[in-house]
């Protein structure tokens, strides 16, 4: 079938299972080919092809609401809702979003990117449906990894209590990004072997209803019998105790079984959970054999061999992080690492190879990870909480209440700080400076290169005056020479990278090389600009700021973070409190959510380019010269 001719899923209504199986094969071939060029979340999508086909055949989207938790498994849904022609632009600038997007299609009723939100969203939609008196089905599709998130468990508890009719499809592939951890994962493991329970329960009801005269009445009061059967055959039916009707486990690649159970779920009153077992990466051998999560999401790859297409370059910041942490941990047994389900992305899997008892993957539990780090710190340990900037948002109260308020020595290693590119607006790491710098006791640092980064990590672990956050980007380092030994850096003291007398740039991190290119252009035009590495975002270098004000230099702050409440705002606040008058402009991320694209394209969009920096400075300098 030509998938690019699909307009909407209505054509599936009359498809036989044989036709659906042929379509599933076409979809898998399409995804493997297209994603080899663009990259993307191939593993999750290959695993849900039959499930997505069954859902769209049995339900009437967009009247019936399909909510895809996290959303990285929604590519098949996008194909069936008319977006196959756009797959050449997947995750590219102004192209097809890698997650559900309400402005992209009426079939995308719930936007995602972070995990564990679909059940709460579904509960809200089901409540609105009942208040309005309509009858649409609400279906949330959530993975076994996302189900371990605290918000999902909160929603399960409320849904079970309210007994709203909605369907939860648990897509259980035994992996999220990395292999799942925790007690709930163990419960699901037991349920995977409990198919006999569902069959026995259905058979029991059928037998009871066949009893002359009394059968119907007995069937209506058979819950205690079924409960006894449940405890006889399955150790702890977690979901039924939460108030759900549990159906499964179902083979997620068996269309007959899938359609039977989903049809039963539609007819069942109250909340229903359909437990579907899928194979992540199904149909593509390299992805099927992945045991570490490497094929969860990828860049481009060679379709025939599965070999990843990698550009040579310096080590990545996460690799420098893990290797430096190992060096320090060899000398200090108090150093421990905590990650919320991102051991591979953060490279803490490298740390765990050497120190398996000192690395803790707590699952999708950013709040717990933050407070566990605080608890470790109270006992004299040196916890390093490694978390993506975008996911640190999910544990903000714990950073405030448990870490900063108690002034505990926790190092928060903020990975993916700044614009991350293809994952788009749900993953851009541009808010952490704004939401952290208002907190008492915290120190915020940001290195300009990988060499400064290793010294900064050492400084952070040695620091014993409270919490310290170190921000660093996703990509490769700059290729600078790495010092052999580690040393402590002064906190709250900036350094001048380039002297100048016409104006000064205050910036840090990834914006240093961008500013250097701007200064090269300005130098050719006859301007002499000072460049300052403001690597201590909090505290500021107050002595240097006072000296700059006394020189009456025009100042330009540049940051790869939001302007509102950011570094530039901190500099303005300082001068306001001191009553000092300076000519200052700020450059950074404007007040909107930045969508997907390459980082260089996004720099162009938000104005963080050498040309825009040079133009901004030139617009300031004539005013300065005129006053002189």
Curated annotation (Swiss-Prot):
EC number: 2.2.1.7
Cofactor: Mg(2+); thiamine diphosphate
GO biological process: 1-deoxy-D-xylulose 5-phosphate biosynthetic process; isopentenyl diphosphate biosynthetic process, methylerythritol 4-phosphate pathway; terpenoid biosynthetic process; thiamine biosynthetic process
UniProt GO cellular component terms: cytosol
Catalytic activity: D-glyceraldehyde 3-phosphate + pyruvate + H(+) = 1-deoxy-D-xylulose 5-phosphate + CO2
InterPro entries, A to Z: Dxylulose-5-P_synthase (IPR005477), THDP-binding (IPR029061), Transketo_C/PFOR_II (IPR009014), Transketolase-like_Pyr-bd (IPR005475), Transketolase_BS (IPR020826), Transketolase_C (IPR033248), Transketolase_CS (IPR049557)
Residues that coordinate or bind thiamine diphosphate: 72, 113-115, 145-146, 173, 284, 366
CDD domains reported in the protein's UniProt record: TPP_DXS, TPP_PYR_DXS_TK_like
Pathway: Metabolic intermediate biosynthesis; 1-deoxy-D-xylulose 5-phosphate biosynthesis; 1-deoxy-D-xylulose 5-phosphate from D-glyceraldehyde 3-phosphate and pyruvate: step 1/1
Domain of life: Bacteria
Cofactor notes: Binds 1 Mg(2+) ion per subunit.
Gene Ontology terms, MF aspect: 1-deoxy-D-xylulose-5-phosphate synthase activity; magnesium ion binding; thiamine pyrophosphate binding
Record keywords, A-Z: Isoprene biosynthesis, Magnesium, Metal-binding, Thiamine biosynthesis, Thiamine pyrophosphate, Transferase
Coiled coil (UniProt feature): none
Binding site for Mg(2+): 144, 173
Function: Catalyzes the acyloin condensation reaction between C atoms 2 and 3 of pyruvate and glyceraldehyde 3-phosphate to yield 1-deoxy-D-xylulose-5-phosphate (DXP).
Assembly description: Homodimer.
Annotated family: Belongs to the transketolase family. DXPS subfamily.
HAMAP family associated with the record: DXP_synth
PANTHER family: 1-D-DEOXYXYLULOSE 5-PHOSPHATE SYNTHASE-RELATED (PTHR43322), 1-DEOXY-D-XYLULOSE-5-PHOSPHATE SYNTHASE, CHLOROPLASTIC (PTHR43322:SF5)
Name the record gives this protein: 1-deoxy-D-xylulose-5-phosphate synthase
Organism field: Shouchella clausii (strain KSM-K16)
């Amino acid at each position: 079938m030509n998938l690019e001719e699909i307009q909407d899923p209505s054509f599936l209504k009359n498809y036989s299972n044989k036709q659906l199986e042929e379509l599933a094969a076409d979809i898998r071939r399409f995804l493997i080919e297209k994603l080899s060029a663009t990259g993307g979340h191939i593993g999750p999508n290959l695993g849900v092809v039959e499930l997505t086909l069954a859902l769209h055949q049995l339900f009437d989207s967009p009247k019936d609401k399909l909510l895809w938790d996290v959303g990285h498994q929604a590519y098949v849904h996008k194909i069936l809702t008319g977006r196959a022609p756009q797959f050449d632009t997947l995750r590219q600038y102004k192209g097809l979003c890698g997650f559900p997007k309400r402005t992209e299609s009426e079939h995308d009723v719930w936007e995602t990117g972070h995990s564990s939100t679909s059940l709460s969203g579904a509960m809200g939609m089901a409540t609105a449906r009942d208040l309005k008196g309509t009858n649409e089905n609400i279906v949330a599709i959530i993975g076994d990894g996302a189900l371990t998130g605290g918000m999902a468990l909160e929603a399960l508890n409320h849904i079970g209590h309210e007994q709203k009719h909605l369907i939860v499809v648990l897509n259980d592939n035994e992996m999220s990004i990395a292999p799942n951890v925790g007690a709930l994962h163990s419960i699901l493991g037991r349920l995977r072997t409990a198919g006999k329970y569902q069959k026995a329960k259905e058979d029991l009801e059928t037998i009871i209803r066949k009893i002359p005269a009394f059968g119907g009445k007995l069937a209506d009061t058979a819950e205690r019998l079924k409960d006894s059967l449940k405890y006889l055959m399955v150790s702890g039916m977690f979901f039924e105790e939460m108030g759900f009707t549990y159906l499964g486990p179902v083979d997620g690649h068996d269309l007959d079984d899938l359609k039977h159970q989903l049809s039963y779920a539609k007819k069942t009153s109250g909340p229903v959970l359909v437990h579907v077992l899928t194979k992540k990466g199904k149909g593509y051998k390299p992805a099927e054999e992945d045991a570490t999560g490497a094929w969860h999401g990828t860049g481009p790859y060679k379709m025939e061999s599965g070999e990843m297409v990698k550009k040579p370059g310096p080590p990545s910041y996460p690799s420098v992080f893990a290797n430096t942490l190992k060096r320090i941990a060899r000398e200090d047994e108090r150093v421990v690492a905590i990650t919320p389900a991102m051991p591979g992305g953060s490279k803490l899997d490298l740390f765990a190879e050497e120190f398996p008892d000192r690395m803790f993957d707590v699952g999708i539990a950013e709040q717990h990870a933050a407070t566990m780090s605080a608890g470790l710190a109270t006992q004299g340990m040196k916890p390093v909480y490694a978390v993506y900037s975008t996911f640190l948002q999910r544990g903000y109260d714990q950073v405030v209440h448990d870490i900063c308020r108690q002034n505990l020595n926790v190092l928060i290693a903020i990975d993916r700080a700044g614009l991350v590119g293809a994952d788009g607006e749900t993953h851009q790491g541009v808010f952490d400076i704004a939401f952290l710098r208002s907190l008492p006791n915290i120190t915020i640092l940001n290195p300009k290169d990988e060499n400064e980064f290793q010294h900064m990590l050492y400084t952070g672990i040695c620091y014993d005056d409270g919490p310290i956050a170190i921000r660093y980007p996703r990509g490769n380092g700059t290729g600078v020479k790495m010092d052999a030994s580690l040393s402590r850096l002064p906190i709250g003291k900036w350094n001048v990278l380039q002297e100048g007398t016409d104006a000064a740039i205050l910036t840090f991190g990834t914006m240093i090389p961008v500013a250097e290119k701007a200064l090269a252009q300005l130098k050719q035009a006859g301007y002499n600009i000072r460049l300052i590495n403001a690597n201590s975002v909090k505290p500021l270098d107050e002595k240097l700021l006072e000296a700059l004000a006394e020189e009456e230099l025009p100042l330009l702050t540049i940051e790869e973070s939001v302007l509102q409440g950011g570094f530039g705002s901190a500099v303005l606040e300082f001068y306001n409190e001191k009553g000092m008058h300076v000519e200052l402009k700020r450059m950074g991320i404007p007040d909107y959510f930045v969508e997907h694209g390459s980082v260089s394209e996004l720099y162009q969009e938000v104005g963080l380019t050498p040309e825009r920096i040079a133009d901004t400075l030139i617009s300031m300098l004539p005013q300065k010269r005129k006053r002189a």
